[in-house]
């Protein structure tokens, strides 16, 4: 049965086509701020139990869509699935975040790295993509909203792989980058091949847009960012499938702290650039001059403010971008686990309401 996408506003915005309103989805929209997510996670037994079982991943992917009229779903998974598939031994210790049992720190460690067989090691992710697409679609083939697939960037994955987990200063991975750039580039080359293969597998399974999360690109100095992060994002994009089943598959790239390099990111071949909250959205639109769509960029902590303040800040973001195509509303980073769900409802409602008013010329 041919499928019909009932709400394609998000995809049209990414392609800079006119829309009746500004679409919104939120980074980490399926997460710990939702009581129903915590209940499902308890049933799954752990975060990895949740992410590695397609039924659970599907359930939590859909949970925010049941609460809020969001314009896209994003696959529930984790950016560290690729290094886990490489055999580095991923674990999430309570209160400590991700840890790898076998960090990559020596020439011998690097020599062991290889691009994983996506089907053999990450089939649970592509199974989840297919299952989510089915769950988003009714018996008459009508799909509610598009599904986003994603991966960490080659550099961001390398940060966790070399550090062995999270870090405050990334001194281990940066030391390798400066002392042994040959090793770092070997890691990044393998990661770029793996990320491209992983995203292409998600696209083939049914992801209708993909996003590259370069969470730690902003930790690099100018110059180092281009060598160790941006160049490898560009390599991933060059290998991506950009059409599937006759439809364009837009790609989004997001470097947290990357406002300095907006023009360079926009020139990588992406359809859209994600922005954090430190960037003025209106000026960003002028800087990219319509070459790409922009996604962002409300400070996530604003969601702790009173409802009217949330609505006012949402209007400010929308007003900054103005009545132009090519904007997807999002937060400047992932939603906090402590965010009141009712405040998210206020945000989504105001983004839809005010952007419709802007389109109609009614302003605020």
Swiss-Prot record:
**Which HAMAP family would you find in this protein's record?**
URO_D
- What is the name attached to this protein's record? Uroporphyrinogen decarboxylase
Q: Which UniProt keywords apply?
A: Cytoplasm, Decarboxylase, Lyase, Porphyrin biosynthesis
**What chemistry does it catalyse, as a reaction equation?**
uroporphyrinogen III + 4 H(+) = coproporphyrinogen III + 4 CO2
Q: Which family does it belong to?
A: Belongs to the uroporphyrinogen decarboxylase family.
Give the species.
Burkholderia pseudomallei (strain 1106a)
Please state the Enzyme Commission number of this protein.
Answer: 4.1.1.37
Query: Mainly localized where?
Result: cytoplasm
Q: What task does this protein carry out?
A: Catalyzes the decarboxylation of four acetate groups of uroporphyrinogen-III to yield coproporphyrinogen-III.
Q: How does it assemble?
A: Homodimer.
One GO BP annotation of this record: protoporphyrinogen IX biosynthetic process from glutamate
Q: Name one GO cellular component term.
A: cytosol
Q: Look up the record and name the pathway of this protein.
A: Porphyrin-containing compound metabolism; protoporphyrin-IX biosynthesis; coproporphyrinogen-III from 5-aminolevulinate: step 4/4
Any single GO molecular-function term of the entry would be:
uroporphyrinogen decarboxylase activity
Task: Note the superkingdom of the native organism.
Answer: Bacteria
Point out the annotated site residues (description: Transition state stabilizer).
Answer: 78
The entry's localization annotation reads: Cytoplasm
Record-listed substrate binding positions = 28-32, 78, 160, 215, 333
């Amino acid at each position: 049965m041919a499928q019909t996408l009932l709400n394609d506003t998000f995809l049209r915005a990414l392609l800079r086509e006119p829309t009746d309103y500004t679409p919104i989805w939120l980074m980490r929209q399926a997460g710990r701020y939702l009581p129903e997510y915590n209940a499902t996670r308890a049933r799954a037994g752990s975060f990895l139990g949740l992410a590695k079982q397609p039924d659970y991943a599907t359930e939590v992917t859909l949970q925010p869509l049941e609460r809020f009229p969001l314009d896209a779903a994003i696959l529930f998974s984790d950016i560290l699935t690729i290094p886990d598939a490489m055999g580095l031994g991923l674990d999430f210790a309570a209160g400590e975040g991700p840890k790898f049992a076998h960090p990559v720190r020596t020439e011998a460690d690097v020599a062991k790295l290889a691009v994983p067989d996506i089907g053999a090691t990450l089939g649970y992710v592509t199974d989840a993509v297919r299952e989510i697409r089915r769950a988003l679609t009714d018996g008459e083939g009508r799909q509610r909203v598009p599904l986003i697939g994603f991966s960490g960037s080659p550099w961001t994955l390398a940060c966790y792989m070399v550090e062995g987990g999270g870090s405050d200063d990334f001194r281990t991975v940066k030391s390798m980058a400066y002392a042994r750039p040959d090793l770092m580039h070997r890691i990044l080359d393998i990661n770029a091949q793996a990320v491209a293969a992983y995203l292409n597998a998600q696209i083939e399974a049914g992801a209708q847009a993909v996003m590259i999360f370069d969470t730690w690109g902003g930790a690099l100095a100018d110059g180092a960012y281009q060598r160790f992060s941006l160049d490898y994002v560009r390599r991933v994009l060059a290998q991506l499938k950009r059409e599937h089943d006759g439809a364009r598959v837009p790609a989004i790239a997001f470097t947290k702290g990357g406002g300095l390099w907006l023009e360079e990111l926009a020139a990588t071949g992406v359809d859209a650039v994600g922005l954090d909250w430190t960037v003025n959205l209106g000026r960003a639109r002028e800087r990219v001059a319509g070459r790409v769509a922009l996604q962002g960029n409300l400070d996530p902590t604003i969601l702790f403010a009173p409802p009217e303040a949330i609505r006012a800040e949402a209007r400010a973001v929308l007003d900054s971008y103005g009545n132009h195509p090519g904007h997807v509303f999002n937060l400047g980073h992932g939603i906090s686990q402590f965010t009141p769900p009712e405040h998210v409802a206020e945000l989504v409602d105001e983004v839809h309401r005010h952007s419709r008013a802007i389109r109609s010329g009614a302003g605020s």
